A protein has these predicted regions:
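Conserved beta-strand scaffold positions in the cores of enzyme catalytic domains, especially
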Residues: 35-37, 123, 175-177
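N-terminal phosphate/diphosphate-binding loop that engages ATP/GTP or pyrophosphate donors
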Residues: 19, 26-92
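Hydrophobic anchor at the beta1->P-loop junction of P-loop NTPases
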Residues: 9
Length: 201
């Protein structure tokens, strides 16, 4: 067994990174392990992807992270406690999406420290340009990667520079590339990887 404490799941866009992590989390929860962290599910309207939300894996709190037509307070969070959003030209854009970095700040500032302190496994879906618009996300993700709690993170396949490249080049990471002929077996492989690294609390 390697000494790596961070598993990076990577592959091309729409290769199944999020699905693999969701199925892995389900297996760990069924085993009675505590899992925390962040996920970034896509949002679709009339079959069209219109943006991404950000979700606290442990609490279920959900907020709007990015939208094609910009983000606004009206989008809000599912619990009605969303902070005022940036919007319009002042908000960062990634491709066609406008990103609300303040929402990522808020959820990353709660979900990731809580997961590091209290969970058996930290999930980060994903480490990608939208999330990196939040300095708080970068700080908390870095802290999670540096500590001993196992981390499962999705990361873009072609990332080689900056923070993304630095994460991929960490000596304490093990990379899992999604292959079409092994996709169905990957969640159990990842779950076993985590189980072997969970330390008694």
């Amino acid at each position: 067994m390697s000494d790596a404490t961070n598993a990076l799941v990577t592959g091309p866009p729409r290769s199944g990174k999020t699905t693999a992590l969701k199925r892995t989390v389900s297996r760990l929860l069924e085993d009675g392990y505590a899992v925390g962290g962040l996920s970034s599910p896509e949002c679709r309207e009339a079959g069209r992807r219109v943006g991404f939300d950000i979700v606290d894996v442990a609490s279920g709190e959900r907020a709007v992270m990015a939208r094609v037509d910009g983000v606004s307070e009206a989008d809000g969070a599912s619990n009605g406690r969303d902070e005022p959003c940036e919007s319009g030209a002042s908000a960062p854009t990634i491709g066609k999406y406008t990103v609300d970095a303040s929402v990522v700040d808020r959820l990353a500032g709660r979900a990731l420290p809580s997961a590091v302190d209290d969970a058996d496994c930290v999930v980060i879906d994903e480490i990608a340009p939208m999330q990196l618009e939040s300095d708080r996300f970068v700080r908390e993700a870095t802290r999670a990667l540096e500590l001993s709690t196992p981390v499962l993170a999705a990361i873009t396949l072609d990332a080689t520079d900056g923070f993304l490249g630095a994460v991929k080049n960490r000596s304490d990471t093990e990379r899992f590339v999604i292959e079409p002929d092994a996709r169905d077996a990957l969640p159990e492989t990842l779950a076993e990887w985590v189980r072997s690294r969970i330390r008694p609390r």
